[in-house]
Swiss-Prot record:
Pfam families: Ribosomal_L16 (PF00252)
NCBIfam families: rplP_bact
Gene (name only): rpl16
Primary localization class, coarse: plastid
Naturally occurring in which organism (per UniProt): Cuscuta exaltata
Protein name, per record: Large ribosomal subunit protein uL16c
Compartments where located: Plastid
GO biological process, one term: mitochondrial translation
Family annotation (CDD domains): Ribosomal_L16_L10e (cd01433)
Molecular function in Gene Ontology: rRNA binding; structural constituent of ribosome
Family: Belongs to the universal ribosomal protein uL16 family.
Record keyword Ribosomal protein present: yes
Any one GO cellular component localisation term in the record: mitochondrial large ribosomal subunit
Keywords: Plastid, Ribonucleoprotein, Ribosomal protein
């Protein structure tokens, strides 16, 4: 699972998922990509599940790039704990995804294989996504 090696602070505020993604919304490495259409927190488990599904489906051909990284800690309080006494402990990591963000990229495979691999990866995601193709050869 993906997680930062070290962070400056152990805990973070939740923040707001407003607006669209202005960074990471263009295809940079591959020819095909999976783009988010909704805002969400994607956990490191979900990102890894999508990556595994794509690598299994594409088999040996092609290369896959994961364009998001879970760098936000989510804290969870223990079950049946009274209110107060501070914030919970960091439990898992999430990547903040806004509409327009590229999640995965793929190159070196045919359009048919890429579309099939991305559709399987998209089924692992908690958000609507779209398959896009780079105009630049």
């Amino acid at each position: 699972m993906l997680s930062p090696k070290r962070t400056r602070f152990r805990k973070q505020h939740r923040g707001k998922l407003k607006g669209i993604s202005y960074r990471g919304n263009h295809i940079c490495f591959g020819r095909y990509a999976l783009q988010a259409l909704e805002p969400a927190w994607l956990t490191s488990r979900q990102i890894e599940a999508g990556r595994r599904a794509m690598t299994r489906n594409a088999r040996r051909g092609g290369k896959i790039w994961v364009r998001i990284f879970p760098d936000k800690p989510v804290t969870v309080r223990p079950a049946e704990t009274r209110m107060g006494s501070g914030k919970g402990c960091p439990e898992y990591w999430v990547a903040v995804v806004k509409p327009g963000r590229i999640l995965y990229e793929m190159g070196g495979v045919t359009k048919k294989i890429a579309r099939r691999a991305f559709s399987i990866a998209a089924s692992k995601m908690p958000i609507r996504t779209q398959f896009i193709i780079s105009e630049i050869e």
